[in-house]
Amino acid sequence: MLDDRARMEAAKKEKVEQILAEFQLQEEDLKKVMRRMQKEMDRGLRLETHEEASVKMLPTYVRSTPEGSEVGDFLSLDLGGTNFRVMLVKVGEGEEGQWSVKTKHQMYSIPEDAMTGTAEMLFDYISECISDFLDKHQMKHKKLPLGFTFSFPVRHEDIDKGILLNWTKGFKASGAEGNNVVGLLRDAIKRRGDFEMDVVAMVNDTVATMISCYYEDHQCEVGMIVGTGCNACYMEEMQNVELVEGDEGRMCVNTEWGAFGDSGELDEFLLEYDRLVDESSANPGQQLYEKLIGGKYMGELVRLVLLRLVDENLLFHGEASEQLRTRGAFETRFVSQVESDTGDRKQIYNILSTLGLRPSTTDCDIVRRACESVSTRAAHMCSAGLAGVINRMRESRSEDVMRITVGVDGSVYKLHPSFKERFHASVRRLTPSCEITFIESEEGSGRGAALVSAVACKKACMLGQ
């Protein structure tokens, strides 16, 4: 009897593995994704193909990295998701002549009506938060230079001027797309009239992360975010950046690689679950690469896999709870928690219980395998993109072996128990001629924006502006 049951459990697990095998990517698959990513990057950089390229390769006008001589107080704003952060950054000489960066910050959550109302409502709310922060720190009387981390696709015309191309991540505030974001912020500050600010720089969160990590390690020339969304930036040779005049030196390019796949480059790798996630998203047909990796989508992918296993009578005796059938019910943090389970399955059992399920031991094991399959594919897909960037940098610099540091931020990278190990191992397999160091950014977005502002202020002083 026991043997029969054991055989049935083994057969069930084997069927589960057959279904989950769809998520496995072979090294040849990853090399294919990497080569296609490089081709799209090239198209994004070139003037004649930029418009139709899915990977936009947006110039950021960040050319210099901090040298350690900029000092002063800077205000930093960070808008990239449902939370908005205001930070005071003091850049100065530390002990023994070292450079020191001290920060104080406060988080504000953005109400739904500000995210989806008008641009005026959104930026009025942001300036209200700045006003509140300055009151708390008794700094209303000071006109501070301000660095703005704005983590949406922007076409820069200068370091302090950028046109919002399109909202992502659930934002829909009308009247912002096609307009200068810094102008919208300046107008809102003017409307309030109770404080003055000098907006000197606007950067993407990947750029802010790279600059913040450069402060720790001067070989950091790539910034990457794996959180709600997924994106990367890197220092490109100016001669390859056709959208900006000049051939000397390097400029940081914001790849906006989340949109890779929007022209069909990933079609052969998309599964039924991916198509369902895409169809029910706020932007169907867009940001397809990001939807395979980002935390906004990972939990939902797992939920759809679990429903398939229920329908195949391989999980929960073929019956799903009402909660499990509800879109968004299986949160991405559950994926991390399930994979963090120590082996007694308590954590998995508790999560499934909150979803109205009474799982068996085998159910718990199957749910864990589903989570591992989805998150491992995410790590491997992400590795193909980064390997594409790094191999490109090595080739354009004609280096036999390139040493490089990548600064990384984002909740999936930082909080998932195995993502970074799987990701690092896969990147290294795909970049055999590179020695890569990964560092995690601390308060990256805010500190990085302030350091970019410090560079901009120093330049302005040198130019006598």
UniProtKB/Swiss-Prot annotation:
Effect of I211F: Increased glucokinase activity based on measure of catalytic efficiency. Increased affinity for glucose
Domain Hexokinase: 10-454
Cell compartment(s), UniProt: Cytoplasm; Nucleus; Mitochondrion
Effect annotated for changing Y61S: In MODY2; decreased glucokinase activity; decreased affinity for glucose; increased affinity for ATP
Catalysed reactions, as listed in the record: a D-hexose + ATP = a D-hexose 6-phosphate + ADP + H(+); D-fructose + ATP = D-fructose 6-phosphate + ADP + H(+); D-glucose + ATP = D-glucose 6-phosphate + ADP + H(+); D-mannose + ATP = D-mannose 6-phosphate + ADP + H(+)
Activity versus pH, per record: Optimum pH is 6-8 with glucose as substrate. Optimum pH is 9-10 with glucosamine as substrate.
Annotated ATP binding sites: 78-83, 228, 295-296, 332-336, 411-415
Pfam annotation, one family: Hexokinase_2
Function (record text): Catalyzes the phosphorylation of hexose, such as D-glucose, D-fructose and D-mannose, to hexose 6-phosphate (D-glucose 6-phosphate, D-fructose 6-phosphate and D-mannose 6-phosphate, respectively). Compared to other hexokinases, has a weak affinity for D-glucose, and is effective only when glucose is abundant. Mainly expressed in pancreatic beta cells and the liver and constitutes a rate-limiting step in glucose metabolism in these tissues.
UniProt-recorded name of the protein: Hexokinase-4
